[in-house]
Amino acid sequence: MSHHFPLFSSKNKGKPQRLPAKLWYQFVRYWQRNIWHKVVVCLVVFVVLSVGTMYGIARWYIASEAHKPLTMGVTFIPDYAKSLGLDPAKTMDAVLDELHVKHLRLVSYWSDIENDKGSYDFSQLDWQFQKAEAAGAKISLSIGLRQPRWPECHPPQWAVNEPKSVWQPQLETYMKAVIERYKNRPSLESYQLENEYFNTFGECTDYSRERLVQEFNMVKQADPARPVIISRSNNYGGLPLGKPTPDLFGISVYRRSWDANVTRRYFEYPFPAWYYGFLAGAQKLTTGKDTVLHELQGEAWPPNGQSIDQTSLAEQNKSMDARRLKQTIDFGKATGMRTIDLWGAEYWYYRMSTLHDPSLWNVAKQEFTK
């Protein structure tokens, strides 16, 4: 059955036609073509509307957060400093005194604190708190089984082969001991619970939501005054709407890594800064909770599973040099998130003191002293 459009009949030939009518006519004619044309049209419309909506949410979030002060900090892990041949205390002193860092993300590895079952050694974490407080810095303390740095989960050796019914209550007992020891410290600002919990990367065996909910409730009961941060998945668009709902969401942003599975080359994530602003904005709209950028890549990603100290400086520069660090920091600021913790402070100090390359350290110093 043919369609008849009077506006376009021979009677109207030579007469001026209104633009909306002409567009509608062209659209109808196009729509009458085969199914693949329709699929393409629908796909294009869907993509344009989706990206437009995402971008709009991102711009709203960035604008709504712009009035808040920017807090920049670093993650500091003594065990990692040791692995690079550094003195952890001296490294932390340099971070606080030379870079003038005022926000620290610290760890409380179960394997370090309860190396012997039932016996707690807080000495290493104690001196970190003391140094932070002497410098007037605030602390976000990572707690739980899964914490920053490989192998991601950090159980003591005596708990490795225990069934979950045994190690889980022991884990909670240790976590309560950590909270009780530090909850009255003036420098303690927040807890980060189970870093990147649902990421399967690393040597971990349990990802049950039930355990995460149970731990969250325990932490809030032990210290109701401090906000609890829980990580969302890094570059993925889905919103973490399942329980528990933390006080703040955390996100990690890595811009360049080594693809060991497919291309065996360095891989640059294509997402613009506003994409992460969209993730934070959508999170705020759906849950009412804000997002912090608690892990922004600031160190090289060695190829083929090598460690940093096995990798030449020239190779390290392929994934992180001074120019890229500055660009990454600017990228982090452009997301709109107002709390940013950089990843790699120990690495910057290693490059300066061991490899005699202060370029990254100098970039960080310029940023933290602005």
Model segments located where?
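Boundary/entry segment of secreted carbohydrate-active catalytic domains
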Residues: 52-102, 107
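Substrate-binding cleft of secreted/luminal carbohydrate-active enzymes
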Residues: 189, 290-370
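N-terminal Sec-pathway targeting helices
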Residues: 19-51
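Short, acidic/polar
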Residues: 82-98, 170-181, 233-242, 321-331
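Aromatic-lined substrate-binding rim segments of carbohydrate-active enzymes
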Residues: 89-159, 203-229, 244, 360
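Hydrophobic faces of well-ordered beta-strands that scaffold small-molecule active sites
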Residues: 70-76, 104-106, 139-143, 189-193, ...
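Glycoside hydrolase catalytic-domain groove-lining segments
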Residues: 225-229, 233-306, 355, 359-363
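Active-site groove signature of glycoside hydrolases
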Residues: 146, 171-206, 341
